């Protein structure tokens, strides 16, 4: 099995190195091939997603991705900025389903900004559609307003749109995920205001007829954002569009105490996927050896589970992470009084030892 390893920028190389260390410690050996991406790709080839990197990603069975982005590239034109690499990979590999778990480990309850009783036992899966919605809808741009109270003045505009096949395929993914959990699925939209959201809701209801064992419910996105902070344990699997999912998954991540604990998977129709931590490249702490590698290590576990069909090995990694937390190991972002605070490499070593 070939894994494309794309460390990227900032803390990306440091945290990916620890995930690779864990993969190499397993009984099974994988072919790991590294390539530059993001700012590193731009430095190597003049583009954030070099042709050779894209070719490797297409050829591999799965992709382990670090993070991209750095302030020093902010002056580049948009198409050349590091962040375009992840958008390009999603597009070229047809990755349309994003899985973002939000799990509050018992050992980290006190690190959450919410009261312990609100987050103890929290286990949410957010399924976000990645390829449609207002992020990619056309037309978009800046122009002189053709009408309205400020006709002739400059205005910015975007287009929110979803096709039925796009909604149906993410619906099936979400329903199937719910079948493997508590058989509850919440669809989040804004159907009281947006035609696109009403269409989304109608398609979700239609697809639900194929999943009689799953209870489908609906919630407006503003209420969902409030309920995530008020009573997050009411949720199990949430499915939503690209923009709403982008916002809600970041909110859910902070319920757990640190975004440094949260993995993510972006999958195509055949479960080939790109796996990355939910956090960014954090250039302000790059090279200091203090970044939390656990989200990336857990992303490697998701890679084994979903793309390589190695559930037993994925379970081993997840158990090892829990063991390390039980032993009191903490990076600075999740440190609590009395813990054993360690750096990036030492945390990776602890997970390997726990294996």
Swiss-Prot record:
Its main location: cytoplasm. GO terms for molecular function: 3-isopropylmalate dehydrogenase activity; magnesium ion binding; NAD binding. GO terms for biological process: L-leucine biosynthetic process. Binds 1 Mg(2+) or Mn(2+) ion per subunit. Pfam families: Iso_dh. SUPFAM superfamilies: Isocitrate/Isopropylmalate dehydrogenase-like. The record marks 135, 190 as: Important for catalysis. Keywords: Amino-acid biosynthesis, Branched-chain amino acid biosynthesis, Cytoplasm, Leucine biosynthesis, Magnesium, Manganese, Metal-binding, NAD, Oxidoreductase. Its cofactor is Mg(2+); Mn(2+). The keyword Protein biosynthesis does not apply. It is an enzyme of class 1 (oxidoreductase). Mg(2+) binds at residues 222, 246, 250. InterPro entries: IsoCit/isopropylmalate_DH_CS, IsoPropMal-DH-like_dom, Isopropylmalate_DH. It catalyses: (2R,3S)-3-isopropylmalate + NAD(+) = 4-methyl-2-oxopentanoate + CO2 + NADH. One of its GO terms (cellular component) is cytosol. NAD(+) binds at residues 280-292. It is found in: Cytoplasm. Pathway: Amino-acid biosynthesis; L-leucine biosynthesis; L-leucine from 3-methyl-2-oxobutanoate: step 3/4. Substrate binds at residues 90, 100, 128, 222. Transmembrane segments: none annotated. Its EC number is 1.1.1.85. Catalyzes the oxidation of 3-carboxy-2-hydroxy-4-methylpentanoate (3-isopropylmalate) to 3-carboxy-4-methyl-2-oxopentanoate. The product decarboxylates to 4-methyl-2 oxopentanoate. Belongs to the isocitrate and isopropylmalate dehydrogenases family. LeuB type 1 subfamily. Homodimer. This is 3-isopropylmalate dehydrogenase. It comes from Burkholderia thailandensis (strain ATCC 700388 / DSM 13276 / CCUG 48851 / CIP 106301 / E264).
């Amino acid at each position: 099995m070939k894994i494309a390893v794309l460390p990227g920028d900032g803390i990306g190389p440091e945290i990916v190195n620890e995930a690779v260390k864990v993969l190499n410690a397993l009984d099974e050996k994988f072919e790991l091939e590294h390539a530059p991406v993001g700012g590193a790709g731009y430095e190597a080839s003049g583009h954030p997603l070099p042709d050779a990197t894209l070719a490797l990603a297409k050829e591999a069975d799965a992709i382990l991705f670090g993070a991209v982005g750095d302030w020093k590239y902010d002056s580049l034109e948009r198409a050349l900025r590091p962040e375009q690499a992840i958008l390009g990979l999603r597009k070229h590999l047809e990755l349309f389903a994003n899985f973002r778990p939000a799990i509050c480990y018992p050992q980290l309850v006190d690190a959450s900004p919410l009261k312990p009783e609100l987050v103890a036992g929290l286990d949410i899966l957010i399924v976000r559609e990645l390829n449609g919605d207002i992020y990619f809808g056309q037309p978009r741009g800046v122009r002189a307003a053709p009408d309205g109270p400020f006709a002739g003045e400059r205005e910015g505009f975007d287009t929110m749109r979803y096709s039925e096949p796009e909604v149906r395929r993410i619906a099936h993914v979400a329903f199937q995920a719910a079948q493997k959990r508590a058989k509850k699925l919440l669809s989040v939209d804004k159907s009281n205001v947006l035609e696109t959201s009403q269409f989304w809701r109608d398609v979700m209801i239609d697809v639900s007829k194929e999943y009689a064992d799953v209870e489908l419910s609906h919630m407006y996105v503003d209420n969902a954002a409030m309920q995530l902070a008020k009573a997050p344990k009411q949720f199990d699997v949430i499915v939503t569009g690209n923009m709403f999912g982008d916002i809600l998954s970041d909110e859910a991540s902070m319920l757990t105490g640190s975004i440094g604990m949260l993995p993510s998977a972006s999958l195509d129709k055949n479960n080939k996927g790109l796996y990355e931590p939910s956090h960014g490249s954090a250039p302000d702490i790059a090279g200091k050896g203090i970044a939390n590698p656990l989200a990336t290590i857990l992303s490697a576990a998701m890679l084994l589970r979903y793309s390589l069909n190695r559930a037993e090995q994925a379970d081993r990694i997840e158990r090892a992470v829990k063991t390390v937390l039980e032993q009191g190991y903490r990076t600075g972002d999740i440190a609590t009084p009395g813990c054993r605070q360690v750096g990036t490499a030492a945390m990776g070593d602890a997970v390997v030892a726990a294996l």
